[in-house]
A protein has these predicted regions:
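Active-site helix of classical SDR
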Residues: 103, 138
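N-terminal Rossmann NAD(P)H-binding glycine-rich loop of SDR-like oxidoreductase domains
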Residues: 8, 16
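C-terminal helical subdomain
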Residues: 162, 182-221
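Active-site loop immediately N-terminal to the catalytic Tyr-X3-Lys motif
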Residues: 81, 129-133, 186
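Substrate-binding pocket helix/loop in short-chain dehydrogenase/reductase
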Residues: 79-80, 87-89
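Residue(s) in the substrate-gating loop at a strand-loop-helix junction
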Residues: 122
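Conserved NAD(P)H cofactor-binding loop of Rossmann-fold oxidoreductase domains
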Residues: 71-76
Length: 221
């Protein structure tokens, strides 16, 4: 089975659709249901206690885990001077803590099944961007966690991928900024194209591990 966090919207939703079409059992972990999921485990990933319950629900399904894709995330666009402690907790809990705790709670089954792990970071986790200090810090942290996972699982059959796409069109950016325009004038990538790229990485032979991939928007004119 394919476990996807945050499959109710955006990239997670497109991934769920692709895997459903491929005949895989899809398990969504998020606050809202995913129409493509075979199992919806509705939990708030900001809360550690709910993540533990979600992990137990996954294990109770009794099926091998093929991949865990940590896709759930929230965006923060706030200038320095206006960042609050609550905002830091909101972003770090969803973007970093949730992935760490979910993997930690499932690690024995992950090793047993040789399950792959994909942590969806961002190009914001590779360089600094104006007004994205908290979001950027969360994505840098997620990349750090991924690097540690790669070391800890290097002698297993589990592949660990840091997936770092640039901006693609979802409701996430529009909700945070009130618009859907790119700052540099390039066109947004499509979530379905980004999802296909991620799936293709996991479709590679098991002895091929793409440790990190960066996908940038490219001007077409």
């Amino acid at each position: 089975m394919i476990i996807i966090t945050g499959a109710s919207d955006g990239l997670g939703l497109e991934l769920a659709k692709l895997y459903k079409e491929a005949g895989k059992k899809v398990v969504n972990i998020s606050r809202r249901p995913c129409k493509y999921a075979d199992e919806n485990i509705l939990k708030n990933l900001r809360e550690g206690s709910e993540i533990e319950v979600a992990a137990k629900a996954v294990l109770a399904l009794g099926e091998p885990i093929e991949a865990l894709i940590n896709c759930a995330g929230v965006l923060s666009v706030e200038p320095l001077g206006k960042i609050t402690e609550d905002e830091i907790k909101r972003v770090m809990s969803t973007n970093v803590k949730a992935a760490i705790l979910l993997v930690s709670n499932l690690i024995d089954r992950i090793k047993q099944d040789g399950a792959d792990i994909v942590n969806v970071s961002s190009t914001v986790g590779l360089k600094g961007y104006v007004d994205q200090a908290v979001y950027g810090a969360s994505k840098w942290a997620l990349r750090g966690f991924t690097a540690n996972l790669q070391t800890e699982l290097k002698d297993t059959s589990s592949r660990v991928i840091s997936f770092c796409p640039g901006g693609f069109k979802t409701k996430l950016f529009e909700k945070a900024t009130g618009n859907d325009n790119t700052a540099d004038g390039t066109e947004w990538m499509r979530a379905e194209d980004v999802a296909l790229c991620l799936k293709q990485l996991l479709d590679l032979p098991k002895n091929m591990e793409v440790s990190e991939i960066v996908i940038n928007r490219k001007a077409t004119k």
